[in-house]
C-alpha cells in the first residue's frame, strides 16, 4: 500500500546524480550549469550568508533540515524553547529542561498562550558529574524527531525528543541522571520511594514519571535534586502523565524503556478514492521489558482522520486536545480537495471591462529583477493575468505576460551576466550553500538568506509560474531547458528523497504538526512560527502544477500530499472551521499566526484587520477555492473582519454610522477582502467591488482583472461543494441552489473520463477543461 518516498521519486535521484557530477567541474567557473541555466557556487558579491557554524555532531552525515520545531538546536550552542507537544523542552547548559504547558494554557480575545515560562520549570535533566555542559548539538534526527547530544569532555548525555511523544528518553556516558527541580520546595512524591526504579512526582497540577532502569535507587528524596543510581545501566526516561492514577502509572511503566530511535513518514495519493494516505512509523529499541510499541499522542488533524485505536488518555495543547494511542505506527486518510490549473471566465463577465483591466496591467512597467518575495508576487500576478487573457481569447495579451514570466525566471535561473561573469546579489541569481544544503535566491528578503526563512513562500511563486508556462509551452520545462532549475527549487523546499546529498528531506513541512514552519532558525521563546498559511499552500500548488505540466506524477503526487496535509491543518488550527479547537475565551475568528507555543491574531507587519486576515488568503489563484470549502465559516470570518475593521477605523477617529456602506470600509487590500467574501456571498462581493472599481488599486500580488474574474465566476457558479470528490486530480464542484457545476481539467494528450463521487461522469478533451451543470441534484 505504501512505497517509501525515496523509491517513488525517481526523478530526483537521477537528476541529483547529474548535478553532483557537474559540481565537480564548478570550482573554476563558480557555477554549475543546469540545462541552459544554472546556479552559483561562489557567494555573489554583496550577499549575506547563514552562519558558518552548525551545531551538529560528527556522527551526523545526512543533510540537516532547517525550518523545524527543533531548528534552534542546530543554530545555537544551546537551543531556544522547543515545542514537541505535548511537552515543551529546552537544551540548556545544565541539561534538558522539561515542561508540560497543557494544564496552564490561557486564552484572551486575540491570543492562545501555551508557552514555556522563563527559568527552569518544571525540571532539568542532567548528569551528576556535570554542572554545565559545553554544548548541546544535533546528533541525529528523524522525520519529526531529534536527538540532542549534551557533551563535556568525554561525558555525554543523549536525549531523544519526539513530537507527539509524552516521553523523553536518555542514554548517557559518565555520571548518573540528575533531575534538578526549579521550585524552592522539593517535588511531591506521589508514587515510589528511594528503593523503587520509578518515581511519580507532582509539580503543581502536572504529573511526571521518572523511569530509571530496573534495580535502580534514588537519592535526594525530600530535596530539589534527585539522582538515580542506575545499577550500572546507561538509560533513563521521563514522561508527562495524563493523570496520577495507578492505571496510568502501570501503563507508562510498561513502555518506559522502549526508546524511539527514528521516525519515518510515507505517503500515497489514492486517486480513485481521492484521498492522501499517510503512514507514520516509529522505529524503536527496547532496553528492558517486553514491549516494542510506544505511547504517542495525536493532534486533532490526525485523530480526526485515523482509524487507529485510541485510548481514553488525553493531553492539552495549544492546537486542541491530543489523544493517546499505543503502537509502532498509525495511518491517516485525508480527502484531497482537488485543484484546477485555470478557472473559466464565465459568460456573465463583462469581457470589455476585463480587457480594460488587463490592458491597465500591461501598461505597468514590468519588474524583471527584485527580491525573491516581491518578484515572486509579481510572477504570481502575471501568471493569473496570462491565464485570464487566454480565457478571454486575447492570446496577444497572454503572450505579453508569459514573456515577462519567462524573462524574469530565465534571468534568475542564469548565474552569469552577458559578459560571462558571475552576477552580483542585486542582479537576480540563485546560489547553492554547501554548508547548509540550500539554494538561496538573491536579492533576498525577510531573512531568506542568512536565516533561511520563508523559502516555501518565495519559491512557491516561481514554481507555480513555471508550471503555467510549461502548461502552455511544454518544451520550456524540459530538464535540458529550464525545468532542471525549477526542480532545484522544489528540492530546496520539499525534497522527498532522504538520500539526496544536496538538500534535506521536506525542509518546510512539519509532517507531524501537519503544516509548514517559516523560520529557518526557530530562535524564539514561542518556538517556530508560520504566518501566511495560504502562501504555503501556493507553494504546494505550484509543485502539483509543475509535476502535471511536465507529465511527472511523482512530483505531482508530492505536491498533492503537501497541499492536502497543509489544508487540513489550516482548517483546524488557523480557521477552526468546526469550532472545536480554539478556546472559548479566544474570541477572534481566526488564528493568523501559529507558533509552537501559542496562536495569535496578529501579523509581523500590520495591525490593519484587512491585512491581518488577508495574509492567510493571498495569493488568490485557482487553488484558492480550498478557502471556500466551509462557506458558513467564510461568512463568519468575513463578519468578524467587518467588525474588526469598524473598530480599527473608529480608533483612528473615523466615525462609522449606521448608513455607512461596507464597501467604504476597505482601504488596504480591498480586492483580497472581497475575493474572500465572494466565497460565501458573491452577490454582495460583486456589488461592493463594482462600487469601488473606478478608483480601486489591487494588492501588489493581485490584479483587478483577477478579482473581477474570480468574483463573477462565483456569482455564476455559487459556493464550493466539498461533499463531492473525483477520481481525477484536477477538479472542482460548485453549488448554487439546486444546480451543481462540475469542472475538470485534462493535462493529457487524449480525452480522459472523470467520475465524481456522486456518479456524475465527465469526458474532458485533451489539454483543456470541461464544465457540466446538472440541475437535478438536490440536497
Please report, for each region that a protein language model flagged, where it lies by residue.
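Ser/Thr/Asn(+Pro)-rich, low-complexity disordered segments
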Residues: 27-456, 486, 496-515, 519, ...
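Alpha-helix capping and helix-loop boundary segments enriched in small/acidic/polar residues
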Residues: 373, 449-453, 457, 477-481, ...
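Inter-helical turn/loop segments and adjacent helix faces that build the functional surface
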Residues: 389-396, 469-480, 543-557
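Bacterial N-terminal signal peptides that target proteins for export
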Residues: 2-11
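Bacterial N-terminal signal peptides
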Residues: 11-20
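Sec/Tat signal peptide C-region and signal peptidase I cleavage site
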Residues: 21-26
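Polybasic, positively charged surfaces/segments
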Residues: 539
Amino acid at each position: 500500500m505504501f512505497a517509501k518516498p525515496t523509491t517513488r521519486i525517481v526523478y530526483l535521484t537521477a537528476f541529483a546524480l547529474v548535478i553532483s557530477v557537474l559540481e565537480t567541474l564548478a570550482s573554476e567557473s563558480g557555477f554549475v550549469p543546469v540545462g541552459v541555466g544554472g546556479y552559483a557556487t561562489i557567494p555573489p558579491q554583496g550577499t549575506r550568508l547563514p552562519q558558518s557554524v552548525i551545531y551538529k555532531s560528527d556522527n551526523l552525515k545526512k543533510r540537516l533540515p532547517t525550518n523545524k520545531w527543533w531548528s534552534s538546536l542546530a543554530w545555537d550552542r544551546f537551543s531556544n524553547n522547543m515545542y514537541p507537544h505535548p511537552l515543551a523542552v529546552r537544551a540548556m547548559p545544565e541539561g534538558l529542561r522539561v515542561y508540560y504547558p497543557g494544564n496552564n494554557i490561557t486564552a484572551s480575545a486575540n491570543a492562545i498562550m501555551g508557552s514555556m515560562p522563563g527559568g527552569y520549570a518544571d525540571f532539568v535533566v542532567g548528569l551528576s558529574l556535570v554542572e554545565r555542559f559545553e554544548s548541546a548539538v544535533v546528533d541525529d534526527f528523524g522525520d519529526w524527531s531529534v536527538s540532542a547530544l549534551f557533551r563535556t569532555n568525554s561525558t555525554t548525555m543523549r536525549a531523544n525528543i519526539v513530537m507527539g511523544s509524552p516521553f523523553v528518553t536518555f542514554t548517557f556516558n559518565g555520571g548518573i541522571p540528575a533531575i534538578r527541580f526549579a521550585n524552592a520546595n522539593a517535588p511531591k512524591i506521589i508514587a515510589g520511594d528511594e528503593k523503587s526504579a520509578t518515581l511519580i512526582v507532582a509539580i503543581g497540577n502536572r504529573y511526571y514519571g521518572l523511569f530509571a532502569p530496573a534495580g535502580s535507587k534514588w537519592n535526594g528524596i525530600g530535596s530539589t535534586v534527585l539522582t538515580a543510581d542506575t545499577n550500572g545501566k546507561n538509560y533513563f526516561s521521563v514522561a508527562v502523565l495524563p493523570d496520577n492514577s495507578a492505571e496510568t502509572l502501570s501503563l507508562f511503566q510498561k513502555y518506559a524503556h522502549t526508546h524511539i530511535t527514528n521516525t519515518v513518514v510515507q505517503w500515497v495519493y489514492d486517486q480513485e478514492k481521492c484521498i492522501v494516505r499517510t503512514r507514520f512509523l516509529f522505529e524503536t529499541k527496547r532496553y528492558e521489558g517486553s514491549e516494542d510499541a510506544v505511547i504517542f499522542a495525536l493532534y486533532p488533524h490526525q485523530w480526526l482522520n485515523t482509524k487507529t485505536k485510541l485510548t481514553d488518555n488525553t493531553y492539552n495543547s495549544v492546537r486542541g486536545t491530543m489523544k493517546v494511542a499505543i503502537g509502532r505506527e498509525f495511518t491517516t486518510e485525508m480527502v484531497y480537495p482537488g485543484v484546477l490549473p485555470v478557472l473559466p471566465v464565465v459568460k456573465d463577465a463583462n469581457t470589455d471591462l476585463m480587457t480594460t483591466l488587463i490592458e491597465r496591467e500591461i501598461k505597468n512597467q514590468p519588474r524583471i529583477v527584485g527580491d525573491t518575495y516581491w518578484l515572486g508576487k509579481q510572477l504570481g500576478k502575471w501568471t493569473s493575468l496570462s491565464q485570464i487573457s487566454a480565457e478571454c481569447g486575447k492570446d496577444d495579451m497572454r503572450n505579453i505576460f508569459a514573456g515577462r514570466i519567462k524573462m524574469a525566471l530565465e534571468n534568475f535561473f542564469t548565474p552569469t551576466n552577458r559578459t560571462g561573469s558571475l552576477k552580483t546579489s542585486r542582479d537576480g541569481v540563485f546560489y547553492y550553500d554547501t554548508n547548509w544544503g540550500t539554494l538561496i535566491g538573491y536579492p533576498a528578503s525577510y531573512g531568506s538568506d542568512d536565516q533561511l526563512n520563508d523559502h516555501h513562500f518565495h519559491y512557491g511563486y516561481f514554481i507555480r509560474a513555471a508550471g503555467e508556462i510549461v502548461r502552455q509551452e511544454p518544451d520550456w520545462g524540459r530538464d535540458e531547458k529550464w525545468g532542471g532549475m525549477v526542480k532545484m527549487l522544489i528540492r530546496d523546499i520539499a525534497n522527498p528523497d532522504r538520500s539526496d546529498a544536496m538538500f534535506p528531506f521536506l525542509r518546510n513541512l512539519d509532517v507531524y504538526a501537519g503544516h509548514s514552519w517559516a523560520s529557518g532558525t526557530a530562535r524564539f521563546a514561542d518556538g517556530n512560527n508560520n504566518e501566511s498559511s495560504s502562501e504555503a499552500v501556493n507553494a504546494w500548488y505550484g509543485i502539483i502544477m509543475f509535476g502535471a505540466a511536465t507529465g511527472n506524477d511523482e512530483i505531482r503526487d508530492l505536491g498533492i500530499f503537501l497541499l492536502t496535509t497543509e489544508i487540513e491543518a489550516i482548517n483546524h488550527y488557523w480557521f477552526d472551521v468546526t469550532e472545536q479547537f480554539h478556546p472559548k475565551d479566544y474570541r477572534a475568528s481566526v488564528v493568523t499566526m501559529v507558533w509552537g507555543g501559542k496562536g495569535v491574531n496578529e501579523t509581523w507587519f500590520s495591525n490593519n484587520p484587512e491585512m491581518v486576515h488577508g495574509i492567510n488568503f493571498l495569493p488568490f489563484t485557482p487553488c484558492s477555492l480550498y478557502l471556500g470549502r466551509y462557506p458558513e465559516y467564510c461568512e463568519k470570518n468575513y463578519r468578524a473582519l467587518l467588525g474588526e475593521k469598524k473598530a480599527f477605523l473608529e480608533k483612528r477617529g473615523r466615525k462609522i454610522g449606521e448608513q455607512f456602506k461596507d464597501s467604504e470600509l476597505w482601504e488596504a487590500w480591498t480586492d483580497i477582502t472581497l475575493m474572500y467574501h465572494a466565497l460565501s456571498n458573491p452577490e454582495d462581493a460583486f456589488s461592493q467591488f463594482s462600487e469601488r472599481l473606478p478608483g480601486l488599486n489591487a494588492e501588489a500580488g493581485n490584479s483587478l482583472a483577477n478579482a473581477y474574474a474570480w468574483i463573477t465566476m462565483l456569482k455564476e457558479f455559487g459556493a464550493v461543494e466539498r461533499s463531492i470528490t473525483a477520481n481525477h486530480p484536477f477538479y472542482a464542484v460548485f453549488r448554487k441552489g439546486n444546480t451543481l457545476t462540475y469542472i475538470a481539467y485534462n493535462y493529457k494528450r487524449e480525452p480522459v473520463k472523470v467520475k465524481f463521487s456522486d456518479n456524475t461522469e465527465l469526458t474532458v478533451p485533451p489539454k483543456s477543461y470541461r464544465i457540466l451543470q446538472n440541475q437535478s441534484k438536490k440536497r
